[in-house]
Amino acid sequence: MSTPVNYLIPRQKDELHKAILAYFSASGLSNTGAALREELGVGDEFLDQNTMKKYEGVLEKKWTGVLRLQKKIMELESRLSSLQSELDSATPTSLTRRNVDPSSWLPRAPAKHVLTSHRNSINSVAFHPIFSVLASGSDDTTIKIWDWELGELERTVKGHTKAVLDLDFGGPKAGVLLVSCSSDLTIKLWDPNNEYKNIRTLTGHDHSVSAVRFIPSAAGEYLVSASRDKTLRVWEVATGYCVKTISGHSDWIRDVEPSHDGRWLLSAGGDQTTRLWDASTAEHKATFLGHEHVVNCCVFAPPSSYPHLATIAGLKKPPPATSSSEFIATGSRDKTIKLWDARGTLLKTLVGHDNWIRALAFHPAGKYLLSVSDDKTIRCWDLTQDGRCVKTVDEAHSHFATCLRWAPAPAKEQTNGEAKTNGIPKAGEKVINVRCVIATGSADMNVRVFAS
């Protein structure tokens, strides 16, 4: 039967042996160390004084790390057991009574967690697509990695020399990466599977890099960035090469958003315009004119919202769900949110915020649009009621609310089974698997997680 050490490669075995010998030496167990050297057939040169210093304390750190991991696993197993028990005892009636229908869930105060560690304003938050991991980027030049389920800080990632302006998880299916961009003119790729090691730094922009996103595709090959240098750039993830530069804006580009299928790019800028681009050809397709100040944010509407937006647009039937760029939403420093069709026609202006709009997110089920603003609030706009604001989370933060993300969850198609709406099955419906979790960041230096 194989022992665990047999699964280690030679380099890992050497490191383990050196760590054990260093532990014996530090513990005064010289005879035991000598016996192990003899058993291994190695001399003093295997672990000289310099190497000894390097490996001192390694074994203890690994041991305490394993204990912490075991504790976390036990906590998660306990929570999983509790949630499974709740699920097993739930009925359609109880689910409806408790108002946990995911398609209608909206955030409410108080937040589930307030994550505190940053020392300056927070500019961006991003959810890991699989695990309960949340990243936040700040003016303090750091990235913080949190377990949003437990509300705990896992690590601080350092590397940028100026403010971290945006973050995103994505990339190749073989291994999810984290990308960040900064006022230091760089974009950095980090590997979550290797302690968030910086694996690549992308340079090429001539001014602050405002926004960055992985472009969705089967291979996860590319990412796109927006900059104060008035350009968008498309980069190859594997090499870090810039493969495309897109020009057209006449001022600082504040935001960029790819469509869910990666075919289109949407950019918003200080020139008060939003622009639609073909991602593969860089061809400009449409310009959205109507805001009276800087456009801070832009987002594509998901197909789940098409029926509601089609009604607002006065269409007899919604566009096909296979299309990825039928409607968009933009938020501006003019304190308004605007809804548009893909041709640049303004459909609706949503008024209610008392300060700059900083970020937008569509509810995955398509019924609502959420926004955060420098007025410190989260507002929820009901697209089935002509975009009426149906909920406001007042004082969501104690300072400007700067960023917003909805935790991702995959859509599932029910073909031979039954879908459920408000806990009541309906045959042949599409089920949107909504994760009822959002995160917001603020100039108050806190990240808040709102969850059901």
UniProtKB/Swiss-Prot annotation:
Alphabetized Gene3D superfamilies for the sequence: 1.20.960.30, YVTN repeat-like/Quinoprotein amine dehydrogenase
Subcellular location field: Cytoplasm, Cytoskeleton; Cytoplasm, Cytoskeleton, Spindle pole
GO terms for cellular component: cytoplasm; microtubule; microtubule associated complex; spindle pole
KW Transport (keyword) present: yes
Domain LisH positions: 12-44
PROSITE patterns: LISH, WD_REPEATS_1, WD_REPEATS_2, WD_REPEATS_REGION
Keywords: Cell cycle, Cell division, Coiled coil, Cytoplasm, Cytoskeleton, Microtubule, Mitosis, Repeat, Transport, WD repeat
Residue windows of the WD repeats: 117-158, 160-200, 204-245, 248-287, 290-350, 352-391, 396-435, 437-452
Main localization of the protein described in the UniProt heading: cytoplasm
Coiled-coil zones: 64-91
GO molecular function term, any single one: dynein complex binding
Database matches in InterPro entries: Dynein_regulator_LIS1 (IPR017252), G-protein_beta_WD-40_rep (IPR020472), LIS1_N (IPR037190), LisH (IPR006594), PAC1-like_LisH-like_dom (IPR056795), WD40/YVTN_repeat-like_dom_sf (IPR015943), WD40_repeat_CS (IPR019775), WD40_repeat_dom_sf (IPR036322)
Assembly and oligomerization: Self-associates. Interacts with NDL1 and dynein.
Comment field on protein domains: Dimerization mediated by the LisH domain may be required to activate dynein.
Protein family per UniProt: Belongs to the WD repeat LIS1/nudF family.
Function: Positively regulates the activity of the minus-end directed microtubule motor protein dynein. May enhance dynein-mediated microtubule sliding by targeting dynein to the microtubule plus end. Required for nuclear migration during vegetative growth as well as development. Required for retrograde early endosome (EE) transport from the hyphal tip. Required for localization of dynein to the mitotic spindle poles. Recruits additional proteins to the dynein complex at SPBs.
Name of protein: Nuclear distribution protein PAC1
